[in-house]
């Protein structure tokens, strides 16, 4: 491959050098007519190839050498004009191509030939060259004006982690290439415009000088000289102007090309883009068809022609409408509610196989269950679930992948968190889920296993549900069951789905309203530490919706407190009103278990600092004794819900107490006096004493 590239580079260098030498030679040396024919054929070939290349490139930057190509092709044409002019004036002959073009264009009438030449020259000079020059000028100015903003956007994406350093370098290089290309095109279009003017002047000089030379040196009459030299001069002009026109069109295609990023990645050509963009509206085709039918009714117009065209356009529009309907049908299987928060990607569907990489949350479906799912209903259920999750915790939705799995039972599903599976849930065909079925009806139902978000869930046939209005109101279809199950998992494991990427996204959102606060917070605390604080808050179900209060707390305490655990406690203290309201449900009354001072001191002394952080090293027997006494207090003070009862202790040991009891008493929350403050009226129900 390296050898092949080296050969290509060498041949390219030789070709350009040979072209420059040929241009100089054409201006100086007399050339035989056979060589002039060959060079004229080469000129036409180059112009056709260049036009085709510009039509098939995916973007303008794919042919960044175009301004240089314009310069070389213009010089080649002008040199050929000089060489052919010498041959015409010296020998009254310039080869077969020029003479054939002259006779073809003139067609036996010199005036017709001149008119055709002037029309082509006018079209090239006034329409194509002038328009392309203006577009190039405006494009160069706009590109230059937009460059600082684009560079800042690349830097921002790099800092936010949306781009890798290598991708950022590539984008900067592409941006520099784009600016150089537009600047080069702005100047190169002057070549095209000047070439058209030079072609017109050279032709007029050839005709006048040819008549003078024919009369003076070749003893021709004025008519003979005009006929001979005018035909050759017009032929020479046409042979030059047609390639020049093609090059002008190629330049116009280059600088008017607008490709969106998606189509550029697909390597789409100009023809593909035109067809794709013109084929977006069936209504436009129907309107055009009706107008053409109107033209067919105009007296004197060829009715058959316009009826045929109207029919063709109508059929095309009908086809477009059918394709649009098919596309809408395909989108009916999409699940936009599963997209990650802030994602601009395409809405996912139920995939046939597992994703290539680990996803935050995945749902595996058995074959029969996947076949019977109502996809729009599933999307609606997830949409409601993600809204409820955002309102409850402020958690950015991590995105969900759903795929079919032959390894599962056909009528079951399984929820996975970072590829760790939960208990499979079997779904009897057509049954509804009743979250808390009365005892009297359980004999007619099937117990639902693997659903941690319901106290006594059962599957029951729709026929039994229809007989009871209360059951009809609480019955859930499988789509709702899956969505509620996944949202419950997201709630309980919310801290697993917040990392640096999600933190950056939240900071960007907050920046819109509080740019100064976000800047100060990032100065005080690195983004990674902010992410750690948010994770620890979510780990104990503390909502992170109030990002303003969290960031203000980090600005105050971040520079002072280097221990992340204590920093979280200070943030919790500043969120005390919110935490108190959440803990008491707005009642301000909290039944609490207090720790004896000796217990607090024992826990405090068991906290050992290590290079990796502080850890609780309490003796297992002491831990067991504490758990036993806590259970005794809880049994002696029953409450409606376990979460209504809580331990209240000092701020410096609160986290360690929570970590100690979590494996045994997960529903028992632990708060500190400092965070509850005056927002809660504590009602002690017991004191823990060792």
Swiss-Prot record:
It is a multi-pass membrane protein. It is found in: Cell inner membrane. Belongs to the FHIPEP (flagella/HR/invasion proteins export pore) family. The keyword ATP-binding does not apply. One of its GO terms (cellular component) is plasma membrane. This is Hypersensitivity response secretion protein HrcV. The chain crosses the membrane at residues 14-36, 48-72, 104-128, 196-216, 229-253, 291-315. The keyword tRNA processing does not apply. Keywords: Cell inner membrane, Cell membrane, Hypersensitive response elicitation, Membrane, Plasmid, Protein transport, Transmembrane, Transmembrane helix, Transport. GO terms for biological process: protein secretion; symbiont-mediated perturbation of host programmed cell death. Involved in the secretion of PopA, a proteinaceous elicitor of the hypersensitivity response in plants. It holds the Pfam family FHIPEP. InterPro entries: FHIPEP_1, FHIPEP_3, FHIPEP_4, FHIPEP_CS, T3SS_FHIPEP, T3SS_HrcV.
């Amino acid at each position: 491959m390296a050898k092949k590239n080296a050969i290509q580079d060498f041949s390219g260098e030789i070709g350009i050098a040979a072209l420059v030498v040929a241009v100089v030679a054409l201006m100086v040396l007399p050339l035989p007519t056979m060589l002039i024919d060959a060079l004229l054929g080469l000129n036409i070939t180059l112009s056709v190839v260049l036009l085709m290349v510009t039509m098939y490139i995916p973007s303008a930057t794919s042919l960044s050498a175009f301004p240089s190509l314009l310069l070389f092709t213009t010089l080649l044409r002008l040199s050929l004009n000089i060489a052919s002019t010498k041959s015409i004036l010296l020998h009254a002959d310039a080869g077969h191509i020029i003479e054939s073009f002259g006779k073809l264009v003139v067609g036996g009438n010199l005036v017709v030939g001149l008119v055709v030449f002037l029309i082509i020259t006018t079209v090239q000079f006034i329409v194509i060259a002038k328009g392309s020059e203006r577009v190039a000028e405006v494009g160069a100015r706009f590109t230059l004006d937009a460059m600082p903003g684009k560079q800042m956007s690349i830097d921002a994406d790099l800092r936010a982690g949306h781009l890798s350093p290598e991708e950022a370098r590539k984008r900067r290089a592409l941006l520099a290439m784009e600016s150089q290309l537009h600047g080069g095109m702005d100047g190169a279009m002057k070549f095209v415009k000047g070439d058209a003017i030079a072609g017109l002047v050279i032709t007029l000089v050839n005709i006048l000088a040819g008549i003078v030379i024919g009369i003076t040196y070749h003893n021709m009459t004025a008519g003979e000289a005009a006929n001979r030299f005018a035909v050759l001069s017009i032929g020479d002009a046409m042979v030059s102007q047609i390639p020049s026109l093609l090059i002008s069109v190629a330049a116009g295609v280059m600088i008017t090309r607008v490709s969106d990023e998606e189509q550029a990645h697909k390597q789409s050509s100009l023809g593909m883009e035109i067809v794709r963009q013109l084929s977006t509206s069936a209504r436009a085709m129907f309107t055009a068809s009706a107008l053409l039918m109107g033209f067919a009714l105009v007296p004197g117009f060829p009715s058959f022609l316009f009826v045929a065209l109207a029919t063709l356009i109508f059929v095309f529009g009908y086809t477009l409408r059918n394709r649009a309907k098919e596309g809408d049908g395909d989108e009916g299987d999409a699940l936009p509610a599963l997209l990650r928060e802030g994602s601009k990607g395409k809405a996912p569907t139920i995939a046939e196989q597992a994703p290539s990489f680990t996803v935050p949350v995945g749902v595996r479906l058995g074959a029969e269950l996947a076949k019977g799912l109502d996809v729009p209903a599933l999307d609606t259920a997830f949409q409601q679930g993600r809204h409820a999750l955002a309102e409850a915790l402020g958690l950015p939705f991590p995105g969900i992948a759903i795929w079919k799995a032959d390894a599962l039972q056909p009528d079951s599903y399984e929820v996975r968190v970072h590829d760790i599976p939960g208990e499979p849930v079997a779904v009897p065909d057509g049954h509804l889920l009743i979250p808390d079925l009365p005892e009297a009806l359980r004999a007619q139902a099937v117990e639902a296993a693997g659903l941690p978000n319901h106290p006594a869930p059962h599957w029951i046939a729709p026929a039994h549900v229809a007989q009871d209005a209360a059951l009809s109101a609480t019955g859930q279809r499988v789509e709702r069951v899956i969505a509620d199950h996944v949202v419950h998992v997201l709630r309980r494991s919310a801290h697993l789905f917040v990392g640096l990427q999600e933190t950056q996204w939240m900071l960007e959102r907050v920046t819109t309203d509080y740019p100064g606060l976000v800047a100060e917070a990032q100065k005080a605390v690195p983004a990674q530490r902010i992410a750690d604080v948010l994770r620890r808050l979510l780990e104990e179900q503390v909502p992170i919706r109030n990002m303003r209060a969290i960031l203000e707390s980090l600005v105050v305490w971040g520079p002072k407190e280097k221990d992340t655990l204590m920093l979280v406690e200070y943030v919790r203290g500043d969120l005390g009103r919110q935490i108190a309201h959440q803990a008491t449900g707005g009642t301000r009354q909290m039944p609490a278990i207090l720790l004896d001072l000796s217990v607090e001191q024992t826990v405090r002394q068991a906290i050992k600092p290590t290079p990796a952080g502080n850890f609780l090293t309490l003796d297992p027997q002491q831990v067991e004794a504490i758990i036993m006494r806590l259970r005794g207090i809880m049994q002696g003070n029953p409450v409606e819900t376990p979460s209504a009862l809580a331990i209240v202790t000092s701020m410096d040991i609160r986290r360690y107490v929570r970590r100690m009891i979590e494996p045994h008493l997960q529903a028992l929350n632990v708060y500190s006096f400092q965070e509850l403050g005056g927002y809660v009226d504590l009602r002690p129900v017991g004191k823990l004493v060792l």
